[in-house]
From Swiss-Prot:
Its EC number is 3.5.3.6. GO terms for cellular component: cytoplasm. The active site is at 392 (amidino-cysteine intermediate). The lineage of its organism: Bacteria, Bacillati, Actinomycetota, Actinomycetes, Mycobacteriales. One of its GO terms (biological process) is arginine deiminase pathway. It is found in: Cytoplasm. The gene is arcA. Coiled coil: none annotated. Pathway: Amino-acid degradation; L-arginine degradation via ADI pathway; carbamoyl phosphate from L-arginine: step 1/2. HAMAP family: Arg_deiminase (MF_00242). It catalyses: L-arginine + H2O = L-citrulline + NH4(+). Its main location: cytoplasm. It is an enzyme of class 3 (hydrolase). Pfam families: ADI (PF02274). This is Arginine deiminase.
């Protein structure tokens, strides 16, 4: 297969290339003692999660999508570039936490590794027991930690590639993740986009050192129109900073800042609303009537911020369409809440009117099908333990333009 062209200007243009992360050893680091800290609601059966993810990737390939695996991209970047290796090691080894003697010894060891084992440690972490050198008599940190404690924290949320980067037009945005357990993820995506041969000419639309914003909060409603959820993860400052960056680079003319609840069940905008067609969204019924948006528009020398309006009205106006269709799932409040928690509204569009969804959300999927949307179901008994659906697990890198 030839390399698919890169760039996205919508949520629903035919998908050509996507970045996924096959779950691996980092999920095996989860225990009842750390899963909350690492943002997982349970302990996934890793082998089954891998089977489910393989089926997801195979489905995309069967539809002509080029699947790029994050672990492969990371290994290839580390293999090609000494600067990439130094960048990854520097981000992983925290001298403030480990102390100078241990940090220096660990960094020296990591520099000796080939690309594949180094990539594994950068993703799956390392415990004190796994250190390949003896106890350093100068390191109080080494002496006072339990052997099972992490000297490098694992990154189980790499599974959700949507959040650490997203594409808009021909550019990529490296996000600024707000939760401590995820901050280092952006160092890996930044490394990949900076050093992998596939992305060397790609320019940036946002940088990780900017105000907090996460890809799950960003919806490309139409060419030039971007919705940004503001809640638990993305801040108002992040939404405003993204808007100004997109305006400066002529990547958008309108950004809709959408307030959402600051709670885990609605951590990102895409947990309650995703696009399923050029003029249609599926939305959590319990917030449909209350969801609002602050339109931010470019003007000479700055921006204008309008008063909040109903989201569906503000979106339709910005998109230049008469009405934004909201798929009426017709669910009672209890069923709606259950299926929202299981990522029923978190769909991945492969083309206009064609989406991937978790099979367990039978009621939502049935309503989508009744509305003319082709639903491609995938299993999710284990993938869902981190609270993310098909959209969360995918970073589209190439779509046909609308």
């Amino acid at each position: 297969m030839t390399d698919a062209p890169l760039g996205c200007n919508s949520e629903v243009g035919t998908l050509r290339a996507v970045i996924l992360h096959r779950p691996g050893a980092e999920l095996q680091r989860l225990t009842p003692r750390n899963n909350d800290t690492l943002l997982f609601d349970g302990l996934p059966w890793v082998a089954r999660a891998q089977q489910e993810h393989d089926a997801f990737a195979d489905l995309l390939r069967s539809r002509g999508v080029e699947v790029l695996l994050l672990g492969d991209l990371l290994t290839e970047a580390l293999d090609k570039s000494g600067a990439a290796r130094m960048q990854g090691i520097s981000a992983a080894v925290d001298a403030r936490r480990l102390g100078a003697p241990l940090a220096q010894e660990l960094s020296a060891y990591l520099r000796t590794l080939e690309a594949a084992p180094l990539a594994r440690i950068l993703m799956a972490g390392m415990t004190f027991d796994e250190l390949p050198f003896g106890e350093n008599e100068l390191s109080l940190v080494r002496r006072m930690h339990h052997g099972g404690d992490f000297v490098i924290d694992p990154l189980p949320n790499l599974l959700f590639t949507r959040d650490s980067s997203f594409w808009i037009g021909p550019r990529v945005a490296i996000t600024s993740l707000s939760m401590h357990a995820r901050v280092r993820e952006t160092s890996l995506t930044d490394l990949i986009y900076a050093h992998h041969p596939r992305f060397l000419r790609v320019r940036r639309a946002y940088e990780s050192r900017s105000a907090p914003i996460e890809g799950g909060d960003v919806l490309l409603l139409a060419p030039g129109v971007v919705a940004v959820g503001v809640g638990e993860r993305t801040t108002p400052a992040g939404a405003e900073a993204l808007a100004r960056s997109l305006f400066d680079d002529d990547l958008a003319h309108t950004v809709l800042a959408v307030p959402i609840a600051q709670e885990r069940a609605q951590m990102h905008l895409d947990t309650v609303c995703t696009m399923v067609d050029t003029d249609a969204v599926v939305m959590y019924p319990n917030i449909q009537d209350s969801l609002t948006a602050f339109p931010i528009r470019r003007k000479s020398g700055g921006v204008t911020i309008d008063r909040a309006a109903p989201f569906v009205d503000a979106a339709a106006d910005a998109m230049g369409i008469g009405k934004l269709r909201v798929i009426d799932t017709g669910l009672d409040p209890v069923t709606a809440e259950r299926e929202q928690w299981d990522d029923g509204n978190n769909t991945l569009a492969l083309a206009p009117g064609v989406v991937v969804a978790y099979e367990r959300n039978t009621e939502t999927n049935a309503r989508l099908a009744d509305s003319g949307i082709e639903v491609l179901p995938i299993a999710a008994s284990e993938l869902g333990t981190g609270r993310g659906g098909p959209r969360c697990m995918s970073c589209p890198a190439g779509r046909d333009p609308l």
